[in-house]
Structures are given as C-alpha cells and as structure tokens.
Amino acid sequence: VLGQNGEGKTTFLRTISGIIKPLSGNYNYAQGIKTAYFGEDTYKNITANDTVLSYLKKHAKQGLLHQELLTLLGSFLFSGDDINKDIKVLSGGEMARLSLLSAITQCADVLILDEPTNHLDFETVEALANSLKDYKGTIFFTSHDRTFTSLLADTIIEIKDKKISLYSGDYETYVYKAKLEALKEEEEEIKFQNNNKNIISENKNSYEDRKKIRNRLSKCENLLKEYE
C-alpha cells in the first residue's frame, strides 16, 4: 500500500484489520478467515510477564516446532541468552521485533503489516522479505523501505487524493506505469498550452518560449515511445 504521508495508509490497514470501522462502504472476508495485524505501536500492548521465547510460544500457531521458533527468533536478532530475556526489560526496538514475529507466526490467512521494517537492519529487512515470499496467505503492508517493497510486493495499492488505484505487478512495474501516466499528463498539458491561443500566441510569446515548449513536447513524445 503506497501513498504520501497523511493519505490514509494506516487508516486503510487498521480498517481492513477490524481495529476501526470503515468511514464509508464495507468489506467482507470469507467465513473462517483469520487476520493478524502489526502496527508501529502494537508492541505497546505487550504486558505479559513472559520471556521472549515463552511469549512467542503462546502466540505462535500450534504445530510450529521448537527449533523453528529458535530459527525465527535468530532471524529477528534474538539469539543466545536474548531468547530468555524477560519482556519487561526489552527495548522499544526489541519489543517491536517480537510483536512483528508474533503476528507472523500466527500463520493467519491475512497478514496486515504497517511499517514492519522500522526497527530492522538491512540484512534483517532482506531476510524478512524473502521469508514472507513463501507466506501461505495474503499480505497487506506499507513500508518506506524500497528494498522490502521491491522484494515482496506483487500488487500495488496506491492511495492518492482520497482515491485508491490498483496496479498489478511488482514495485518496479508500478514505478514504470506511474511515470508513464505522468508523462502522458504532461504531454496533454503541453499540447493544451501549445494550441490554446489564449495562453500561447504568436503575439504574446517570444520565439524562445515557443521553442522551449516544442522541445519539451518532443522530449515527452520520445519518452512515451520508449516506454511503450
């Protein structure tokens, strides 16, 4: 889910996770579908008097082996004595990583992640994206990390000007299509300016002005041909 700050990405994710009610419209999941949500402040709800490992065991889907949990914890920078730390002594970053891992190991049908990479280093971000590629369910997420988005996304939901646009394909495909649309819009604007005598006329614009406009139009047309 992409969009500028303030466009409503978090509101959208919190709505489809059931945390808040829709401002308008409605949505429905099929019967029996389970969701799991991770948000930037989700970790603040962790109050259990557990260790890192015991907390994860309580919240992970039944059937995950002990060694699998240890491997997952290691990939989230919990190793050695860290897994036996009391939750109450964890830092904010550690709490966020544990909360994220807890959401993932629930193995829900729909996993909803709001900025999951904020407390992860580059190697962990890449490892998380690669591991989620094999997730047996649907993942909705928003992230400012381009590497994570490029590795994981196969469909882009863009929120812009209170409207939602759907782009099939990965992040690179989205960027390509977005640039193409921007070029087409600029081409139409330049054509309008070039043809509208109220804006551009032989009497009111110098030769250099008209030359610049023609060059911009030619450049846009060449780029459009290249993209297409």
Task: Locate predicted features.
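ABC ATP-binding cassette signature C-motif
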Residues: V1-E228
